[in-house]
Structures are given as structure tokens and as C-alpha cells.
Amino acid sequence: MPPKASNSTEVWINPKLSVKFPFEPYECQRIFMKNVVDVLDRKLDAALESPTGTGKTLSLLCSTLAWVQRQKETKPLDFATWQTSGAGGAEKTDEKLKSAYVPTIFYASRTHSQLEQVVHELNRTEYKWVKTTILGSREHFCINQKVKKIKESNRQAHVCRGLVSKRACHYYNKFDACTTDKMTEFLDKGEAMDIEDFVKLGTQNSLCPYFMSRQRSETAELILLPYNYIIDPKMRRRYKLDLKNSIVIFDEAHNLESICESNASAELTSTSIALCIEELKKVLALLVDEEETARSEADAETGAFGSAKIDLTKKLIENLRTEDLMTVLEKIFSLEEEMDKLFGSSQLKSVPPLSGKASDGEILLETLAKAGFDANSVERLVDVLRDAISYLLSKNEEVALTEKGDGMEKVADFLLSIYSTHAQDVAAAVGEETVKLVDRVDPKTVARNCKLYIQKDKDNEKLTIKYFCFQASISMRMLKMRGVRNVLLASGTLSPIQAFTYNMGLNFGAILENEHALKQVPVLTSIVTRGKRGGLAGSFQNRKNLDYVTGVAEALLRVMEVIPQGILIFFSSYSQMDELVATWKTTKWSSNSNESFWEKMEKTKRVVVEPRAKEELAAIRLRYTQGVSEQHGAALLAVCRGKVSEGIDFCDAESRAVIIIGIPYPPIHDERVVLKKMYLDDLMGRKDTKSERQSSQDWYQMEAFRAVNQAIGRVLRHKDDFGTVVLMDTRYASAKPEMFPKWLRNTISRSDTDGCALKTSRFFKERGHLIENSKTEYIKKQAKQCKSFRQVKQTAASDSKDDIIEITLEDMFSPANMKLEKKEITKLRPPQLIPSTSSVFSLPTNEDELKIKKWEQENDIQCLSSIPLESNKRKFKIETPGPSTSTLTQKSEPPKKKKILLLTRNTLPDEYQKAIEIPTSELLKDMSDDNKKQFATTLRSYKAESIRWDEVFQRFRPIFVPHKADLFIACSNVLRSEDKMKYLKKALESKIHT
């Protein structure tokens, strides 16, 4: 029931409906909510663009939930009957009553972290009491260690199902035994729960969080879930989503078109087909043996007991029969043969510059039909494959690790994608919302909207079959055919919106390009067309032109010098970023200086680069946030469509400027890009297509500007934020205004490098007092977040029941899991070291150790290297963190060092002295993934005292020597003090020089 008291503002959207909003809404929020309510009333769809910082998520939630509550008031009896129909959900409810339900809201976003933010926003509103759940995979929800330790999500699912069917999962059994009233008591706390809340509740009460969330979805009014759970027909089937009479919201929908196409596409290799055949043979052999054993035992027993044993065997293998397996195996054999024939046939044509061959999608259906597959039988065939996988996984001791059903899984997914994605126009014409699978597949529709691409590996003859869907509207039509009432697409950056709405193929009743909350948007946008050496056209051909590369560097330096705090610099691709940075590192920025452009940039700002590996991002983010709080600020070099361009919130000081170098066009030789352009060119040549059809060049440009607009969105995160946008490429000047978000268009001007720097400098000088205030607030905010983060880590550690800890690279040098080594205290006291609180992240570092070294030198202490910081004073013993070890006091006195006879500060070579001053945060920089794994494994073993220092020496040496010998010597800083001396001595004896 809704709470009686209210601190919300009542906003009347129309004479019949008021919305309870957490505060007095801005005009842009009123407009947004009015558009939502209008399309809900008219049973239409909407595309809603509203700038970041305008409360888009709040507006979506409040307006939609208010509309649904009004529907409940008009149909109270029907709704009450539905909610009290029990855990059986839709399957136990009469269809006539079901059609009278008020709509269920499915709120989809790209990632679980974005959904957690939606939960946070929902709990700020008057509607937090609405029955809500969040769906996710076992990877996020499961608390059973047997399942959690499995990395592959598909195997997790099969193992979980096996444990559940055998009643071997304690958490599921307790969940299954829980009464409806007791479950309601657990879950109805008056506000929405995110994944972390479900997991915590499940852990505390030994209840399965995964099945709790799924069961709650049967009667929930609001269901939060990732995009692909709605779009992907395989996921809809797996989670049994009932979309009839529902409202589907896609938040952050700017990537939805490509996601729809991707989820309607499929891929299969000849290797997977061959593996599927071997796995089916294995299942057949095991099944025959098991049936023979059961019959033999049954013959030896009495009739009654024998029947019982045979029944038990049948229960264990469920519906799996040898006859079905033989039929499936025969078809997979035929599939392998037909695919080989297809590659050599004239139906496939070469597609320069690609190495493979392509055709319309209809050819694939014809090939599958020759192998014995059709829409009538494919679902049963997929069920047999799924049962075979579960059976194979149940034989853990009898089956090799390589025979766990991967081949069968991939073949099943491929077939399901092909036969359950494409909707036939006649289905809508006859008014059937639930159409048989056979009626959903129309070869002509497939041919018009898909391309088949097959590539053969020259070395091993492996075939790769790729089935590309190039029409996002197919996925949207499928949703509508399943009875979806409304589809709402929302984002901060849908522009260019006309092309977006055309490609989605929905019945739009509202297309909104919303203004910003502020009439005067506090953003300065500059298109830099020229540098000192000429035009800045960042085409692929121009990328290696030295005048262009140095021109960009000069322009970048000019604006970096006048922009305070943090700058986000986006490149078109990783390859472009790597090439430019490499040239900047070797090119002098001035004829009168020996400094390179890169060295000059590093003097201007602390410069950090977005890593390719996701697990390294936290450490890089820390270095950036630390730099932002410094006097000169920091610059983060990143890539459009990368990890930094969306999904991470850079507020205020962290994004005073967004600079985009070049235009991020999709890779011209990418398979999907080449075939998509071919598909669009084919459409342009047809007479039966609409006049608004999109050319391949228009699509190519639209894809680039959508990535640009998403990166631009980083600059303004709320109404009090401000910053500049610098588009560093001549070609932006010729772009149509509608390619940019509406709120940005009036802020755009053109200039050369000097003009841009002058305008930018003036912009920030006018806001000098705001910048000074933000510096103080930023430091306070970071300190608060850091404190909160540490408390969470300590609580999680003390609640943990596991004996095994996963050690990350970030933890390796941190003191949280290390035992303090007791040593004598010297009389001299170095300066008090204050732990950094500039970020919530933890990074391996020995910068404070270097401060102590300086203190030692000033006090004439003759010993090797620095007295270690707390992170180096501890023995590297891994412990399960608990209350007694979660907080360690920093000592101001350095421990007394053991006397070293062979090495002193005076006898250590200068090159070694310089090397051991390298911060430990530099050790992982530019290291390959394989070397990082080796480095991590070695350090874990050393910290656990399972290997000695000399083994560390041998393992580290090939990682760093000969190219990075200075870093190899710097690795001594991660060892215990007594081992550090031995390590350095051995390095000297081995004649390792920097």
C-alpha cells in the first residue's frame, strides 16, 4: 500500500492525472512527463531525448507509475484478483482476466549498474512502495559456491538446473519451502531492492536470490532488466517473460538500434558443429549404458522394485530418449555436410575487401531445410539439445572438461536465433498476437533484412558462418506481436533522431528533442578547423601526416593550458590514439626544446590513458581523479564507444572539457559495416521501399555522430555543471545542425586553435569563483566516498563466510589483507603520512615511500633504499579480512632496519638508486595481458608465502628484462625488506643494467 504521508510535489499533467514528483519539476521535466502520459493514453510509442542532468529517469518512472496507478484505480477488482493469484503467475490466471490487467512496466537499461541507479532514483520517489523486482543472471545472483566457481554463464545455468532438479541446492530448497506470506514479509520493505539487496537477503536467510527475484517478477508491477532479456528471443524464452499488455521502457536507448540488430543475428563455426556431434555421441553412449544397467538391475530384482528403478532412471534423464538423440545427430551430420557444400557453391559471392563470401539470408534457410531443419521441429530439437547438455553436465566425474556441452549449446542458440527472430507481416494482418513459430518465419522477409557471410580459415579449413540482421525494426515488431502495449525509448543522445525513429519502425505518437533545464546552457562548443600548420582533417589517410599529427598536438596543448581541473579527450579508435600518442612521444614540441609533445602535455596536466582491459580501468580512474584534485588538473585519453564514453559518471571537476579528436566512423573494413552498407545500397535500388530510406553514407555518418554525441554528454551531468566541448576536426564544420543534440546547437562556433584557446580561457575566467568552490567540494566528496567505500569493504569482509579470497591486482600492494610485522622503532621520526582520500579506488603505489626516503637522506641515515611505507612493512600473508584486521593504524616511526654488510646507499649503483625510486604504480603500465597474469600469480604466491624471493626473481625476469630492466629492479619494492636486499644483490650479480 502507498504511504499516507507525502513530501512530494503534486504535478497535474492533464485534468485526469497528477504525478507525485520528489521536487518542483523544471519545465523540461513537465514536457517530458506530458509526452509520456499522452502516448500511454493513446496506446502509442515514444522517442524521448532529454539532456543529461534533466532528471530523465525520475521523469520516466514517476509519469509511467502514476499512469499505471490510475489504471489500477479504474480496475481495482481485476488487479486485486491478479495479485492474489499466487506464485503460479500468468500460467495460473484465466486469459480473459489477464487481458484486463493493468500494464506491467518492463524497465530496461544496458547494464546492471545502470539499473541499480534506477533503483536508487525510484527510492527517492513516492512510488518506491510499488512491487518491484530486478532480473539478472546467476552470475550476479547465485550464492551457491558450486555454481559461483563456474565462469561460463551457460554452464552455471545447467549446473544450477541439475542441482535444483536433484534437490541438492540448500538455498533453492529453503526458498521452495518458504510460504507466500513469509516471502512477502522478506521482500515487502516499503522500497525497491537492487541485486545487492537480494543477495544480502538471500545470504542472511539461506534463500536463493535468483529464484526469489524471478518468482517476484510473476506478480511485480515494475520489472527492471537488461536490454537483451527483452530483445533476445532466446532470453525471453528462458525467463518466460509475459509481455502481453505491458509497457516497455528502454532507457539509454542510443545504442538500441545496433543492439537489436546484434540480438537478431547469429554465428556458428564448423568447429562447434563438429564438437556438437562428438558431444551427442558421448551422450548416446552414456545413455545406452545407463539404460542397459537399469534393465539388468531391474531383471535381478522383483517386479515392483525393478519398475521403480526403471522409473528412477527415466526421471533422471527426464525426456531424453535415444531415438530423439539419433534423429538430432543425423540432422547435425547433414548440417555439417550442407555448410561445406554451401561455401563452394555459386550462390555465395566475394565481397571485397573481405576475405569471405556473402549472400542474402534466404540462402541460409534453404541450406538448413536441406539438412532437415524447419520451423515446425526446431523447438523440439533445441529442447533435446538442452536436455542432453544437462545430462552431460550431471556426469561430472565421468566426462572430460572438454565435453561439457559447448558445441550443443552453440548449435542450439544458432538455430533458435534463426527460427524465432523474424516476424511475418501476415501475423499482424490476421490480428494474432501469439503466432506459432512456423508462421513467424518468412524467407522473403529474411532475405530483405539479413545477409549471410561465410569465411574459411586458410590454415585449418574452419568455416565461420555469420548471419547478420540489418533491420532493428524486426526486433521491435516482434515485441509488438507479443502484445507489448507501449514502447518508450529514452536517452540523453538520440540525435540524429529522425533516422533513429525511422529505423526503429515503431508507431511513434511522440518524438521529443527536449531543451535543457537551463535556458542558457553553460557550455561553450568550439569546432577547431585549423591549427598552426594547416587544416585539421583527421581522415584515415591523414593520420600519419606529420603536419596533421603535430597540428593536433599543438592545438591540444593550447587548450589544455587554459582548461582547469579535468579534461576528457576522446579519439576515434584505440589505433588512432596509439598512433598519435606514439608520434607525440618522439616528436619535439619546439625547435628550441628537447621535450617531446607528450612530455610537454605531462607537465601541463597529469595524463592518463584508458586501458583496453576492463579490469585495469579502476586503477586508471584513480590516477585521473587524483590528478584532477592537483593544482594543474588531469587529462584522460579515451576512445569513443569505449569504457569511458558512457557508463561512468564524470561530474563537475572531472569533466570541465570534452575534446574529440577526429570523427569516430565505424571501421570501414569491418564485416558488419561492409555488409550493412551493401544491404542499404541494395534497399536504395529497390522500387518497393519507402521514400525516407537511408543511404549507406547517411547511416555511416549517423553512426559516427551518435558516438560523438554520447561522448559530448559527459560534459554536463546536472543543472549546476558547466564546461566546454572542443571538436578538433575540420569536417565537423560541414555537419548539419540536426546531427547534434538540440540543446547543444546554439552553443557551437568555429575557430582556429588560437581563437578556441582565447574563448575557452575567457569562459573559465568568468566562472573562476565556481571553479574554486568546486575544488573544495570535490576534495570533500572524494574523501566522503573513500570513507564510505572502506566501510563497505570492511563490512563485506567481516560478513564473508568464505575461506578463499580473490586477490586483484589492485589489492596486491594494499595493506588491507597483510599482517603487520613487528619491528623495533628508531628514535628519529619521519613526517606523518596521511592516506590519500581522493578516490574510492585503491591503486598500488609507493609514492609515500619516496617521501620517507627523502626524510632519511636529510637525516643522514645510511641504508639501502627507503624505509617501507605501511604497505611494505607488512608480511605478505593472506588472511580472511575480519574486524580485527580491517583497520590498521599507520605508524609514524620507520622500523629499525637489519644491518646489510654488502650493500649500502653508497655502494648501490646510481642506475639502481634511480630505478627503486620508480613508483610501483608504473609496474603494470603497458604490460601485456599474459605478463599481467604471470605477474599477478607470482605476487599472490609470494604473499601467501608459497614461493621464495628467488623464485619471484626468476619469474619476473622474463617479464621485464631486457627492455624494462629498470622496472625489474623497481619490483624489489614489492618484496619484504629482508628479501628486497637479496633481490637487488642477485640483480647486480646477474649484471642486469638499465
From Swiss-Prot:
Domain Helicase ATP-binding: 15-300
Region listing for Disordered, in residue ranges: 876-895
Keyword DNA-binding: yes
EC class of the enzyme, as a word: isomerase
GO molecular function: 4 iron, 4 sulfur cluster binding; ATP binding; ATP hydrolysis activity; DNA binding; DNA helicase activity; DNA polymerase binding; metal ion binding
GO cellular component: nucleus
Protein family (similarity comment): Belongs to the helicase family. RAD3/XPD subfamily.
Protein name as it appears in the record: Regulator of telomere elongation helicase 1 homolog
